[in-house]
Amino acid sequence: MAKRTKKVGITGKYGVRYGSSLRRQVKKLEVQQHARYDCSFCGKKAVKRGAAGIWNCSSCKKTVAGGAYTFSTAAAATVRSTIRRLREMAEA
């Protein structure tokens, strides 16, 4: 086998186009976008991106709304913690 790309990774398809800093930003997004994530329902590492913001678990067939490029966003984590805190305050 021929030696594969070391630095550019998935953005090797762009060649020398678009500039190195833009390709670096795109690489970060595309690696997150194509990765598999842990399913919060069945616990398996089987969640893949179906479309922008739609994430599907291939194991339990659940569909979850998330970020466009990542399964969970920082804003979603903030909302979850706020809801949990408000629920605990209401119960107490």
UniProtKB/Swiss-Prot annotation:
A zinc finger (C4-type) spans 39-60. GO terms for cellular component: cytosolic large ribosomal subunit. Keywords: Metal-binding, Ribonucleoprotein, Ribosomal protein, Zinc, Zinc-finger. GO terms for molecular function: structural constituent of ribosome; zinc ion binding. Signal peptide: none annotated. GO terms for biological process: translation. Pfam families: Ribosomal_L37ae. InterPro entries: Ribosomal_eL37/eL43, Ribosomal_eL43, Ribosomal_protein_eL43, Ribosomal_zn-bd. Belongs to the eukaryotic ribosomal protein eL43 family. This is Large ribosomal subunit protein eL43. The gene is RPL43.
